[in-house]
Amino acid sequence: MNTDITFIIADNQDITRMGMHGYISAIFSGCRMIDVTDKKELMLALVECNDSVVILDYTLFDINGIEEFLIIEKRFPRVRWILFSNELSEDFI
């Protein structure tokens, strides 16, 4: 698999981040993973790795609504986003 991929795991729960590490490592062995626990850390990681894949727990992260997320998404157009949450609705998507 491609080991040039950088995954940014944006979640503030240790157990979820550990699970993501295990799952991603099983599929993309040797890839780079960066853990971030808040928006400030996420922004710093995106500046460093602006072509990464971000796995974001949207509900538990400190992004203030869809408008703010869309601003971040537009600022980093090469980033691919995977959002997960138990509260995402069809309207959101």
Question: Could you describe each region identified by the protein language model?
Answer:
Residues 39, 53-72, 88-89:
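Conserved phosphotransfer microenvironments
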Residues 92-93:
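Receiver (REC) domain alpha4 helix and immediately following alpha4-beta5 loop
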Residues 3-15, 20, 24, 54:
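Conserved acidic segment of CheY-like receiver
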